[in-house]
Amino acid sequence: MSKRTFQPNNRRRAKVHGFRLRMRTRAGRAILSARRTKGRAQISA
């Protein structure tokens, strides 16, 4: 039997997909901008 692949971890989630990480790079800021334009309720983890 293999274990489930998704092992929730809030700290890892924030470090990998968080707002501060997105703001760090030009591409990340572009992602946030696109999500704001689209009207996403949540723009990052």
From Swiss-Prot:
<dbReference type="GO" id="GO:1990904">
    <property type="term" value="C:ribonucleoprotein complex"/>
</dbReference>
<dbReference type="InterPro" id="IPR000271">
    <property type="entry name" value="Ribosomal_bL34"/>
</dbReference>
<keyword id="KW-0689">Ribosomal protein</keyword>
<dbReference type="GO" id="GO:0003735">
    <property type="term" value="F:structural constituent of ribosome"/>
</dbReference>
<protein>
    <recommendedName>
        <fullName>Large ribosomal subunit protein bL34</fullName>
    </recommendedName>
</protein>
<comment type="similarity">
    <text>Belongs to the bacterial ribosomal protein bL34 family.</text>
</comment>
<dbReference type="Pfam" id="PF00468">
    <property type="entry name" value="Ribosomal_L34"/>
</dbReference>
<dbReference type="InterPro" id="IPR020939">
    <property type="entry name" value="Ribosomal_bL34_CS"/>
</dbReference>
<keyword id="KW-0687">Ribonucleoprotein</keyword>
<dbReference type="GO" id="GO:0006412">
    <property type="term" value="P:translation"/>
</dbReference>
<dbReference type="GO" id="GO:0005840">
    <property type="term" value="C:ribosome"/>
</dbReference>
